[in-house]
């Protein structure tokens, strides 16, 4: 498939605030996505394991901005979702209609310091400042470390990490990173109490497919005055 590459706009002082992922807000710049009726943002460190169609259909049918809900620590998984503390948004997956959320970038670019102090990171800011913000249904995206890896000591018994069948997107936040699960040795990965050893087949296959696939990228400079491709670079 051909991929059209668009340059992200200058982010001013936000470019120095990678802790908190503030430069990510450039995706909301006015007119950046002119002609696009719906945008679905995914972090690079996610693994897509199912069709994105239900996610896109949901965002089309329901107005506003949609964001994942941050997952709760293990013990809270034993109670209904409505009983769990709301930890705010998780911006590994966000959907919105371009033009409706331009203020998210404009406001923080105009006066960033109060936003840094009040919200501390991009996902709290997005979730709380979005116009008509909603959480995605919880089965659209899951956490790799919270939903796919057993807590110690059960992880020593159930060592095989199975590919989930329901959700479309598996999010890697914190440790481990997808690349940690592609090594051929039996090195340990993960957190203190949720960890494993060696490669995870389905993550490795997905990650390698992306690295090994021939790249056909359409850059802005490759388009003529009518928006047609002059050439494709590999």
Regions found by a protein language model. Name each.
Residues 48-86:
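Conserved donor-nucleotide/metal-binding helix-loop-beta segment in metal-dependent transferases, i.e.
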Residues 81-97:
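Conserved core of the sugar-phosphate nucleotidyltransferase
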